[in-house]
Curated annotation (Swiss-Prot):
Notes on activation and inhibition: Activity is increased by monovalent cations such as K(+), Rb(+) or Cs(+).
Subunit text: Homotetramer.
Pathway: Metabolic intermediate biosynthesis; (R)-mevalonate biosynthesis; (R)-mevalonate from acetyl-CoA: step 1/3
Binding site for K(+): 187, 249-250, 252, 350
Name recorded for this polypeptide: Acetyl-CoA acetyltransferase erg10B, cytosolic
One BP annotation, GO: ergosterol biosynthetic process
Length: 398
């Protein structure tokens, strides 16, 4: 890794994470993405929108969003029409993969300034009428839920990801109680971080017009953390396997809206513009295995990222492992031997939310905040994705 050109993160920003059909549901994925990009660039003194040469942005449920959501995000944020834009779909890892692609673009000398991240408005995901083009000639027609079809269903087995989370719980011996207690802890960490203002620096508030003459509303916080009710969480019925199941709605991540962006620069541009770096990208790794085992793919990607970075696992001060389900974090901690005291210290996706195309970038943005708050130096973000994959990234806080 030391032989490759350096890539620096000079800023990061994210929207609040909105609940499904909640406070941010009036905004499209490109509008959310544009807000995150604009906020990230506004943090960098000496860098103009016209300096950005390329944008990589994750988005998963792109039906009805319009052509190339990344391009819409870029132009909506005021970037030049000459900015090259690419939308990335690696399911839940899209946002982190976009950042990896941005770093690679700089390292290969194709750009000096890249914006990367991800966006998703699950509230605005449409339903499909797949047979309408050839005609509904006779009988009932069914709507297909775009969220379920393109976001939450294994394309090979045609089964919900939640059933594969159940498979993970069985494979690795995690009970319903263990998953519930983990979910409660992650909610409590998110609530504590929210109360202490630890998300304030990473969140770019969104002002929304008031309804029917009412005053404008400014959304400043993630919506989900306040919803914790431990008694209800422990009592709710399983979501995927009636009776004997261990995975429930509240010990899984919810459906959400949100976006996150980071600004990446080369060392030459950093020095030329006298920019202040936030962090340095040290390495990354991608991995894949049997699609139904997507839950534990981070346990393959994280070691690859650490090796690429030339960093030992014990040297990492904080990990972000995306909580698609509570059991995902539990299983990967177990497989890698990572203590929970180092993982998702400000809460994870179960409590904060999981706007799928954005989450990879969101966990990196939060990781930078965790390292700053805990006075840590090295951090690693890992996230699984549908189809059996995962992506991971290692950073050094500067």
């Amino acid at each position: 890794m030391s032989s490759l050109p350096a890539v620096y993160i000079v800023s990061s920003a994210r929207t609040p994470v909105g609940s499904f059909l909640g406070s941010l549901s009036s905004l499209t994925a490109p509008q959310l993405g544009a807000h995150a990009i604009k906020a990230a660039l506004a943090k960098v003194d000496g860098l103009k929108p016209s300096d950005v040469q390329e944008v990589f942005f994750g988005n998963v449920i792109s039906a009805n969003v319009g052509q190339n959501p990344a391009r819409q995000c870029a132009l909506g944020a005021g970037l030049e029409e000459s900015t090259i834009c690419t939308t990335v779909n690696k399911v839940c890892a899209s946002g982190l993969k976009a950042i990896i692609l941005g770093a690679q673009t700089i390292m290969t000398g194709n750009a000096d300034v890249v914006v990367a991240g991800g966006t998703e408005s699950m509230s605005n995901a449409p339903h499909y009428l797949p047979n309408l083009r050839t005609g509904a000639k006779y009988g009932h027609q069914s709507l297909v839920d775009g969220i379920m079809k393109d976001g939450l269903t294994d394309a090979g087995k045609q089964e919900l990801m939640g059933l594969q989370a159940e498979e993970c719980a069985q494979d690795h011996g995690f009970s319903r109680e263990q998953q519930d207690e983990y979910a409660i802890r992650t909610y409590e960490k998110a609530q504590a971080a929210q109360k202490a203002g630890l998300f304030d620096e990473e969140i770019a508030p969104i002002q929304l017009p008031g309804f029917r003459g009412k005053p404008d509303v400014t959304v400043t916080q993630d919506e989900e953390p306040k919803n914790l009710n431990p008694e209800k969480l422990r009592a709710i019925k399983p979501a995927f396997i009636p009776g004997s199941g261990t995975v429930t709605a509240p010990n899984s991540s919810p459906l959400n809206d949100g976006a996150a962006a980071v600004v990446l620069v080369s060392e030459a541009k950093l020095k030329e513009l006298n920019l202040k770096p936030v962090a340095k990208i040290l390495g990354w790794g991608d991995a894949a295995q049997q699609p139904s085992k997507f839950t534990t793919a981070p346990a393959l990607a994280i070691p690859k990222a650490l090796k690429h970075a030339g960093v030992g696992q014990d040297a990492i001060d904080a990990f972000e492992i995306n909580e698609a389900f509570s059991v995902v974090a539990l299983a990967n901690m177990k497989l890698l031997g990572i203590p929970e005291e180092k993982v998702n210290l400000h809460g994870g996706a179960v409590a904060i939310g999981h706007p799928i195309g954005a989450s990879g970038a969101r966990i990196l943005t939060t990781l930078l905040g965790v390292l700053k708050a805990k006075k840590g130096k090295l951090g690693c973000a890992g996230i699984c994705n549908g189809g059996g994959g995962a992506s991971a990234l290692v950073v050094e806080l500067l």
